Amino acid sequence: MDTHEFHKLLIKVVDLFLEDRIKEFELKLNTTLDELEFEELIGKPDSSNSAENNGIFIDEYSYDASENAIKKLFVEYVRQPEFKYTVLSIKGVNDWVRE
């Protein structure tokens, strides 16, 4: 997935989230950021680790997937496009993006 495709996908995620069309989803990422850098960017890992929680997952860690977290990820990507995020999967309630 190139930079332009990922940019479009993030815009779609933010739009759907703000329109309240995504009730639950997973966003799995492979990133060059280490755990502490990602915590500073997105927030601390969700300690409950419940399958019912929305989440942004890196390795074993589940991060808050609130509106603010998604906006932060989007803003950081646009602000520093040299960070190469790879979307491994995004699942919405209507499977609008398939794995």
UniProtKB/Swiss-Prot annotation:
It holds the Pfam family DUF1374. It comes from the Viruses. Signal peptide: none annotated. Coiled coil: none annotated. InterPro entries: SIFV_Orf14 (IPR009804). This is Uncharacterized protein ORF99.
